Amino acid sequence: MIVEGKVLKFGDKIDTDIIIPARYLKYTDPQYLAQHAMEPLDPEFYKKASAGVILVAGKVFGMGSSREQAAIALKAAGVRAIIAESFARIFYRNAINNGLPAIVLPGVTQLINEGDYVKINVETGEIIVNNQKVYKGRGITGMPLKILESGGLLDYLKKVSVQNQGGN
């Protein structure tokens, strides 16, 4: 699975309250949530991300309260993948379950800059920056990769259910 795009870069400890503020949690429409993603840090984030971007972030991306809407909002805004030094565990699972690749690359904030163009092999963790530099992040394999390739957990379960019933 290959994912690519231009980089938007953020720092350490981006919590779920920053990713999608609590006042929007009563809404379920992914496109509405997307319009408010990262709003406290960058009110123009939705416009920047809509072309399809890769987020680069520091340590413990997605920390704080558990809210699935954080991953939903980012993906709906146009985020194709996130590369971070580390992720909060619950955010990491929510990202995978919603079809949003989350790649760990220690030191990434020193290696990749805002505006760089990156190409990620999700399975191997290979990250190519500006068609020149190559870095090795932690790839995603096994069941998490199958979930991502299906578009998320619900799509994966639908696919498996159809296969188990003798369909395509």
Swiss-Prot record:
Protein name per its UniProtKB record: 3-isopropylmalate dehydratase small subunit
Function comment: Catalyzes the isomerization between 2-isopropylmalate and 3-isopropylmalate, via the formation of 2-isopropylmaleate.
Protein's gene: leuD
A Gene Ontology BP annotation from the UniProt entry: L-leucine biosynthetic process
Record's catalysed reaction(s): (2R,3S)-3-isopropylmalate = (2S)-2-isopropylmalate
Xref: InterPro entries: Aconitase/3IPM_dehydase_swvl, AconitaseA/IPMdHydase_ssu_swvl, IPMI_Swivel, LeuD, LeuD_type2/HacB/DmdB
HAMAP family: LeuD_type2
Example GO molecular function: 3-isopropylmalate dehydratase activity
Keywords annotated in UniProt: Amino-acid biosynthesis, Branched-chain amino acid biosynthesis, Leucine biosynthesis, Lyase
Assembly behavior: Heterodimer of LeuC and LeuD.
Keyword Cell cycle: no
The protein's annotated pathway: Amino-acid biosynthesis; L-leucine biosynthesis; L-leucine from 3-methyl-2-oxobutanoate: step 2/4
PANTHER family per the UniProt record, alphabetical: 3-ISOPROPYLMALATE DEHYDRATASE SMALL SUBUNIT 1, 3-ISOPROPYLMALATE DEHYDRATASE SMALL SUBUNIT 2-RELATED-RELATED
Classification via SUPFAM superfamilies: LeuD/IlvD-like (SSF52016)
EC number(s) from the headed UniProt entry: 4.2.1.33
Enzyme class: lyase
Keyword Nucleus among record annotations: no
Family note: Belongs to the LeuD family. LeuD type 2 subfamily.
